[in-house]
Amino acid sequence: MISTLGIVWGSTFLFIELALQGITPLWLTSARIVFATVITSMIWLMRGGRLFTTNETAWTRLGIIGIISTALPFQLISWGQQYVTSSFAGLAMASMPLFVMPLAYFFNTNEALDRRKFIGLLIGFLGIIILFSPDFTQGNDTSILTTLGKLACILAAFCYATNSILMRKLPSIDPVGLAAMSLLIGSFWVVLWAVTIEGPPPIISAETLLI
């Protein structure tokens, strides 16, 4: 199960890289998130369509989660992969735990930050700096775009880390409903950004559509 999940998760970045050859990043993100919204919402409705399982609600927090769990990271990854490889994008996602620990400590989620964990964090962030170091020594336009692409992927990982902390503070909620609502909120913003920035959706080839 874990190996299958790893293959599916890792191959996502390869498919994004291939799809970007035939569609702009904002509309690629829109297509991905709208498709996922439709499928997840259908499953949620078949399960009864209930969201909060108690009288306690948290709509504002859910709205924020919808943005930082889908809209922002999906967009950042698609934009960043114009300038970085799919392997780097996948590697950048592995930095998420580095952000979770200090965020958990900052938001007082009973996450202790002892010396051993602190040293581990320093080593992890040193690794991120090493990933960026080749770009710092060049300074041309290509390296600047590459650096920005890498930064976008790292920021996407930061969004996922922040989302994992915020979800801990949600009241009792149906997990499928949470996924559906997050995607629905995210799809609204992503499509709005795509129309505003890139204009009407482009005509894409059959090969890109299959990807």
Regions found by a protein language model. Give the residues of each.
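Hydrophobic alpha-helical transmembrane segments
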Residues: S3-T4, S30, W59-I64, L91, ...
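Glycine-/small-residue-enriched transmembrane alpha-helix faces in small-molecule transporters
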Residues: M1-S30, W79, G139-K169, L183-L192, ...
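Hydrophobic transmembrane alpha-helices of multi-pass small-molecule transport proteins
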Residues: T40, S95, L103, R115-D135, ...
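A helix-boundary/kink motif common to multi-pass secondary transporters
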Residues: T24-P25, T85, A112, D174-P175
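Transmembrane alpha-helices of multi-pass small-molecule transport proteins
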Residues: L20-L72, P97-A104, F158-N163, A179-E198
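Specific transmembrane alpha-helical segments of multi-pass solute transporters/efflux pumps
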Residues: I7-I16, S41-M93, I129-I130, P202, ...
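Loop-to-transmembrane alpha-helix entry segments
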Residues: T53-T60, G90-M93, T109-I130, T146-T147, ...
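Hydrophobic alpha-helical transmembrane segments in multi-pass integral membrane proteins
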Residues: L72-W79, G127-Q138, G186-P201
